Regions:
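Peripheral peptide segments
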Residues: 1-229
Length: 229
């Protein structure tokens, strides 16, 4: 099973509807399982996954989530390699918010499923509490999400009790990076690859927030919504 050093930064990424067998997986070995990490919120996550079991193709091959998801964000050149290398170095740990699984480690193995992220469903099943416990257990100092602002993913991350997380004393900064894209026309095709490139650039810059916010992606810049400040 994969073992990584304690991370200094946590990232949240969205899943993708497209899932394909990886040709060159970055996590070919057995991955971690979020359910075995959690203590207080494990039951809620388990129940949430059980309620969506019919959406999962249990006969499909399973692969690490970072390798399996193959939408526009995950097709950005260098994204998988950059994320995997940063995880192995202890720079980051990554949770992918998943419509079928709630949340999974980037190296956690999953089956193919057909289920969009449903904010109401996962709110009832305590997904925000799952994220909160994971943050606290990690001991990380900074937490960022790379998510579209108006999606269910963003709403789930905002629903975390960030004031309580910060009062715990470990998290010094938490933010939600989103492309400042006006309107919805063209967003579905342009925002995901911009998010992927931003993740690669953020890791490559040594997590330089100012540098990321100064760059343009698809003709627009990112904004960072502070969480719990």
């Amino acid at each position: 099973m994969n073992a990584f050093p304690p991370p200094s930064t946590l990232l949240f990424l969205p899943c993708s509807a497209t899932k394909n067998r990886p040709l060159h997986p970055v996590f070919p070995g057995a991955g971690r399982r979020l359910l075995t990490t959690l203590v207080n919120s494990a039951g809620a996550l388990r129940d949430g996954r059980h309620g969506l079991a019919a959406c999962v193709d249990w006969q499909s091959p399973d692969f690490a989530a970072l390798d399996y998801y193959d939408g526009a964000l995950y097709q950005v050149p260098g994204l998988r390699g950059a994320v995997a290398a940063a995880m192995r170095s202890g720079a980051i740990d990554v949770l992918i918010l998943s419509g079928g699984y709630g949340a999974v480690y980037a190296d956690e193995w999953i089956h193919k499923y057909e289920k969009q992220m449903d904010f109401a469903y996962w709110r009832r099943h305590g997904l925000s509490a799952v994220l909160e416990e994971w943050i606290e257990l990690s001991g990380a100092r900074t937490v960022y999400g790379f998510l579209a602002r108006t999606t269910a993913y963003g709403r789930i991350v905002r629903a975390v009790d960030w004031a309580r997380v910060r009062r715990g004393g470990r998290v010094a900064e938490a933010g939600l990076f989103a492309l400042n894209f006006p309107g919805r026309e063209g967003a579905q095709s342009r925002v995901p690859p911009a998010l992927g490139r931003a993740v690669v650039d953020f890791i490559g810059s040594g997590f330089d927030k100012a540098q990321l916010l100064a760059r343009e992606y698809e003709g627009h810049r990112f904004i960072c919504e502070e969480l719990g400040a």
